[in-house]
Structures are given as structure tokens and as C-alpha cells.
Amino acid sequence: NFQYGNATLSYYDPETRTVQNEVFFRANGMKLGDVAQSMIIRDGVGWVVVNNSHVVFAIDTNTFKEIGRITNLTSPRYIHFLSDEKAYITQIWDNRIFIVNPKRYEITGYIQVPNMTMESGSTEQMVQYGKYVYVNCWSYQNRILKIDTETDKVVDELVVGIQPTSLVMDCNNKLWTVTDGGYEGSPYGHEAPSLYRINIDDGKFEVE
């Protein structure tokens, strides 16, 4: 629950079909924090993005013990690895995507998002195709960004409906996003939700 600091991590064992709750707390003797937004596993390490605690924890997936953390983040949402020594972390309430070195748990730079204010900044999920990373901009936004990972610059963008909430790529290299349309009374506007399929090669909408 937002602002309650009661995020938890559970583990499901598919062989025994059992669930262990509060595994982070039991392994580390401290709460996970305020809003565990997302998690990925890479090479036996779990990366838990805790949004309103401004931190990303690295944990051993066998013991659930913390092995490191990335701090001084604004309000992190998702992490995407480019290599062992480089990753992107998206943010809400910030007009930057953070560049980090996961081996050193350090912030090494930023990607400035054009035409986005700090107060209404919102970058979310990331999908990679070749050297480009695509990012949907959610809260009070309507864009999908294209980032060149060699230069760490936004090189293009697609305008979609109001508030694209998620982003995936299918087996045919088609990019899909769905929008929530905002809400009634929103200063950014309100419309019916939409589903988009995008040809990644030419940036054209195939389903809208």
C-alpha cells in the first residue's frame, strides 16, 4: 500500500506447490519498503524495485539476503539490463531515466527525456530490439520513446493514446502497448482505452 511501507516478497516453489511469504523480511530482518513495483532475476540475482522507498535491492535468489542496493533514485519503476555493468531505471515524477552500474550499485548518468517536466515525468516499462530500447511514458503522458543505447539519447518517439500502461514485444518483433485513457476530470484529458500494435521497423501502427 502506497505510503504504508508494507511491501512484501513471497516465494512460490513449483515442485512442492507451496508459498513462503515475507522471505525478504525473514532473511534480512527489515521490511522491503514502500511499494515493491517490479522485480527481475538475472544470473541468480533478484532486482527488486521499491518505488516509494527510492531504492533497488539486489538479493540472492537462494537465500533472499540482500547483496547490494542502488539508492538516491527519485521514484523508480523498472530496471532493464544492457550488460553486467550497465542498466536503465525508469522513474515517475522525474524527467530522466537513470543509468546505473549494477556491479557497483552506482548511478553513472541520466537520459533526459525531451518535452517532459520533472513534476509530470513518467517513464515505465522497457523493451529492447537491437541497440534500441523502447519505453512507454505513462502518467499524464502519451508517448513511446526510442533510445539509442550506444549514445544514451532519445532518438525518436511515437505518440499513442493517453497513458500507455505497459509495453511488450511479441515473437514476430511487433511492439504492443495498451493505454488506460486517463480518468474523468484529469487535467491531461480522458478517452477510451486503446490497444496498439506497432511495426518496429518503420514505426507504423498496424492495430489501433
Which stretches of residues belong to each language-model region?
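Predominantly soluble domains enriched in secretory-pathway, periplasmic, or organellar proteins
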Residues: 1-208
